[in-house]
Amino acid sequence: MVLSKENMLKYSAHLRAYNSACGDHPELKSFDSELQQKTSNLINSFTSDAKTGLVPLPQHAAYKEFTKHLAEVNQQVSDYIIGYGEVVWENSTLRSLVETYFESAKKTLDIAENVTEYVDEAKRGERYIVAAVAQFEKDKENDVGKKTKRYENTLRELKKFEAMGNPFDGDKFTTLFKLMHKEQESLLERVRETKEKLDEELKNIEMEISSRKKWSIISNVLFIGAFVAVAVGSMVLVCTGVGAGVGVAGLLSLPLIAIGWVGVHTILENKIQAREKQEEALKKAHRIANEMDKGMETDKVDMNSISGKVHALKSKITSMLNAVKDATEDGANEVDTKQVMETLTGDVVELTEDIKAVGDDVAKYSKMIEETSYHVLQKITGSGK
């Protein structure tokens, strides 16, 4: 992990410089306060109230919140860079630092937009389920001829869904998280290296105090933007299932304290402590194993449960067909199956709408990132002057 205790040593000097610069420059302090608020909002979006502690969001909802956060921070950084634009265009190293940041934002955008593939899969899966339910209603009324063939059309529709694998698989979102996080980690390293080069230049050249101040502000804004993206990305990965929920504290405490974000750290720590108390109570009640399983459930629908329901339905209908003997039919089992089919329809439609909403929001945030990155890079090349 990039922000491990060992690796944090590489960033310690830059973090101290950032904290010092915040004290020297009110505008940078204002930037920092705004960034802290955005991060606090993100933490709260991943958690319930203080009574229940830290509870992971569904992967698709977490993906939306993380993309929104990246877009907002990107916009915030862009505003500051544009405000000090004339200094950026004068120095090749500072210009390279800005280019590195926004080119990485564009790469992250490309990864984020892959969510559209999952949206399309979810829509196709929804169509198969809706078709299966409609076919079930038709088959149920079909009382002619061989009853052993009665629900074969329904089975055929369910098998189409099964053949897709699992279009609602939350692991697909986690895969995208990992790719985005890896790009953020790479960016942080490149920003650190370029910033160190810039710091050396500042020591060895004569320049006006006002220009030196602007160099310092810009380089610190870019560094902390990249640093926070990695810290937040670590939290998102944990909250979406890569590690236990309480592990977030260990992952984020060090970097949050290092940048002086005591308030943000306190918010996170309170959530973690509430969660730990909750788990301790569950241990005493001998229900901790069940609770840990629930920690990965979505608010209303487990993304993986839909495929499980389809498999169970297919087995149930197959069993019904096998149980038919001449003119005898298991009516009770049929009623039960109908209820499950109706429940499944509601589940899959609701989840598909959620995923479609994520796709719409990600597209909106991606457009924000693309536009701000383009605007800044255009300024750097001189075409936007």
Curated annotation (Swiss-Prot):
Record-linked InterPro entries: DUF677
Superkingdom assignment: Eukaryota
Coiled-coil residue spans: 138-214, 267-294
Pfam family, one: DUF677
Annotated membrane topology: Multi-pass membrane protein
The keyword Transcription regulation is annotated on this UniProt entry: no
Transmembrane portions of the chain: 217-237, 242-262
GO cellular component assignments: membrane
Compartment annotation: Membrane
Keywords assigned: Coiled coil, Membrane, Transmembrane, Transmembrane helix
Known tissue expression: Widely expressed.
Sequence similarity: Belongs to the UPF0496 family.
Protein name in the entry: UPF0496 protein At3g28290
Organism: Arabidopsis thaliana (Mouse-ear cress)
